[in-house]
């Protein structure tokens, strides 16, 4: 009986077709940086040197993934509230807060948004693009930002190249959309959207008392 059991065990171990449970199969990990920093470029900070690198665009797009959605510049439309909520969540992460907006890998976000008392401030990294390559437009309450540069010789044209498109939906009666200012300098786009004052928002007209 013992010899027959040992023989059966040898046959099992020598078999080349042993079924492996799904739970034990190796799963290829997804790099966190590719999910959290899907922009035209990310900046690596090493010894105080600012270096530009193109990021990996092959990002997993599982439905409902908040972080990949909010950081993807090719998402059709994102709301301002989503962007501000994301910034609040990031600021609560000790490591990110300590590195001033950089993740554990030392990579800075490709965009930033700050809401102050008087205006909304946007910063978007668009490396390789000049002021002439960037166009901003307002479609009802949606701010549309487009950038497209000429492809240099030897540059891969099969991907997105130097193209950037983003649509940010602004809430109604909060910002002075007719006073939006934009500045493009050194591959960085800065947009300032003034806020409507509280009394202007509520159509309040103050009357002087003689």
From Swiss-Prot:
Transit peptide: 1-20
InterPro entries: A-crystallin/Hsp20_dom, HSP14.7/HSP23.5/HSP23.6-like, HSP20-like_chaperone
Domain sHSP: 102-210
Compartment(s) where it occurs, according to its Swiss-Prot or TrEMBL record: Mitochondrion
PROSITE patterns with a match to the protein in the record: SHSP
GO cellular component, one term: mitochondrion
Keywords: Mitochondrion, Stress response, Transit peptide
Main location as per UniProt: mitochondrion
Pfam family, one: HSP20
Family per record: Belongs to the small heat shock protein (HSP20) family.
Assembly notes: May form oligomeric structures.
Protein's name in the database: 23.5 kDa heat shock protein, mitochondrial
Gene: HSP23.5
């Amino acid at each position: 009986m013992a010899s027959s059991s040992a023989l059966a065990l040898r046959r099992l171990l020598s078999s080349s077709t042993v079924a492996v449970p799904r739970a034990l199969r190796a799963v290829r990990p997804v790099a966190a940086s590719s999910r959290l920093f899907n922009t035209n470029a990310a900046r690596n900070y090493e010894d105080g040197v600012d270096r530009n690198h193109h990021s990996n665009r092959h990002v997993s797009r599982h439905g409902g993934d908040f972080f990949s959605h909010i950081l993807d510049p090719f998402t059709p439309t994102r709301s301002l509230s989503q962007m501000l909520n994301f910034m609040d969540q990031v600021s609560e992460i000790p490591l990110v807060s300590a590195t001033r907006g950089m993740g554990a890998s030392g990579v800075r976000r490709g965009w930033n948004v700050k809401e102050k008392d008087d205006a909304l401030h946007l910063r978007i990294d668009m490396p390789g693009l000049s002021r002439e390559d960037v166009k901003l437009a307002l479609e009802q309450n949606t701010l549309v930002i487009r950038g497209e540069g000429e492809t240099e010789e030897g540059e891969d044209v099969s991907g997105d190249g130097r193209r950037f498109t983003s649509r940010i939906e602004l809430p109604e009666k909060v910002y002075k959309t007719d006073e939006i200012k934009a500045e493009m300098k050194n591959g960085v786009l800065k947009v300032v959207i003034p806020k409507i004052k509280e009394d202007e928002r509520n159509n309040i007209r103050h009357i002087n008392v003689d």
